[in-house]
């Protein structure tokens, strides 16, 4: 489990970077809370007490999918019988928004209107993976999956919601 950007608010990296400028001290929690693997590390150490593997593969907006693929491969190979895969991302802080805006990476009303050839933006069409787009829409999300090999799920009487046989992650090509 991991996030691509880590915790950037005042409790994490954002607070650590701004503390001295604001006349505050850096807390002992800001650096660890700013690590992109802290959600998994925290749950592993403080909730589950697990001695199993923890780690992450970060890949921008596909971070969850990269980690899901690793878990599926571990279960299919027999290295693991159960895996918890997750991601939580909350990058809506002014510095991140300004950073993406400076890169012209965000979909704006002006760019949406130009792309659609209209005078008013249709925000429902702002996110268009693998298609013509004018940037992306910054958002927050969180999801966690518990994966088990077939026999373990049946032995435990687990309620099975889906099967993940493979995971495909593809980039969406050249950007304009």
Segments (PLM) and residue ranges:
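Domain-wide signal for the mature, well-folded portions of proteins, strongly enriched
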Residues: 24-25, 33, 90, 124-127, ...
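Conserved active-site "lid/cap" helical segment
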Residues: 1-3, 7-8, 66-70
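Active-site-adjacent elements of ketosynthase-type condensing enzymes
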Residues: 65, 90-126, 169-175
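Active-site-proximal gating segment of KS-fold condensing enzymes and close homologs
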Residues: 3-53, 97-117
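Active-site-proximal alpha-helical scaffold in enzymes
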Residues: 36, 40, 44-47, 54-89, ...
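Condensing-enzyme catalytic core mediating Claisen C-C bond formation in acyl metabolism
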Residues: 114-176
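Acidic, glycine-rich active-site loops and adjacent beta-strand->loop/helix elements
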Residues: 3-5, 59-63, 87-92, 166-171
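Internal hydrophobic scaffold segments of catalytic domains
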Residues: 1-6, 76-92, 97-99
């Amino acid at each position: 489990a991991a996030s691509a950007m880590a915790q950037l608010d005042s409790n994490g990296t954002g607070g650590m970077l701004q503390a001295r400028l604001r006349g505050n001290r850096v807390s002992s929690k800001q650096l660890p809370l700013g690590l992109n693997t802290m959600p998994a590390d925290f749950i592993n150490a403080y909730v589950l007490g697990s001695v199993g593997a923890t780690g992450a593969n970060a890949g921008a907006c596909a971070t969850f999918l990269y980690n899901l693929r690793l878990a599926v491969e571990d279960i299919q190979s027999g290295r693991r019988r159960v895996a918890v895969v997750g991601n939580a991302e909350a990058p809506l802080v002014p510095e991140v928004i300004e950073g993406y805006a400076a890169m012209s990476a965000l979909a704006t009303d002006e760019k949406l209107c130009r792309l659609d050839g209209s005078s008013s933006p249709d925000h429902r069409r702002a996110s268009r993976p693998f298609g013509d787009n004018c940037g992306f829409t910054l958002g927050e999300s969180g999801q966690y999956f518990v994966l088990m090999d077939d026999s373990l799920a049946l032995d435990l009487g687990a309620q099975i919601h889906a099967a993940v046989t493979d995971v495909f992650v593809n980039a969406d090509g050249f950007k304009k």
